[in-house]
């Protein structure tokens, strides 16, 4: 939880964190909805990356989607973030995935520069949409027998 809270602080989204240790245990271990890598230096967890599968109908292949990555500020600039990305890329290649994707806040210039240094390209023609809470429930209530 400490990494999640620290990431939320950095992203100016602390109030949005509703995860609990119990909800993380349920979704990550019981449901296996995502996987987590930890960066460990001198026996201490100093960063993490949470990822899961997505799928491209155009490629006809699964992909790797990075939901969150965070390295403690005092450990940045030491290659830890790059090592996490390299390991995620290795996993994607090993599993035969067609791509490795993630989103980044548009104001996060340090991260954008870092991602570009890795060879990643932004997708300015795409806009992310999200349904949560009441909007998600309302739309779910509109479901009918057309979809199977």
Label the predicted regions.
Residues 44, 54-66, 76, 123-124:
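A conserved beta-turn-beta hairpin within the catalytic core of GNAT-like acetyltransferases
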Residues 89, 97, 116-125:
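Conserved acetyl-CoA-binding loop of GNAT-fold acetyltransferases
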């Amino acid at each position: 939880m400490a990494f999640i809270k620290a990431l939320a602080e950095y992203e100016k989204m602390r109030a949005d964190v509703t995860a609990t240790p119990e909800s993380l245990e349920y979704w990550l271990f019981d449901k296996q909805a995502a996987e987590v890598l930890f960066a460990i230096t001198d026996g201490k967890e100093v960063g993490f990356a949470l990822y899961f599968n997505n799928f491209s109908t155009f490629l006809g292949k699964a992909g790797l989607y990075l939901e969150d990555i965070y390295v403690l500020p005092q450990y940045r600039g030491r290659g830890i973030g790059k090592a996490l990305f390299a390991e995620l890329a290795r996993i994607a290649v090993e599993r035969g995935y067609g791509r490795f994707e993630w989103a980044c806040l548009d104001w996060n210039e340090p991260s954008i520069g870092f991602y570009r240094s890795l060879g990643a390209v932004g997708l300015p023609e795409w806009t992310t949409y999200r349904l949560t809470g009441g909007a998600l429930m309302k739309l779910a209530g509109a479901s009918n027998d057309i979809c199977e």
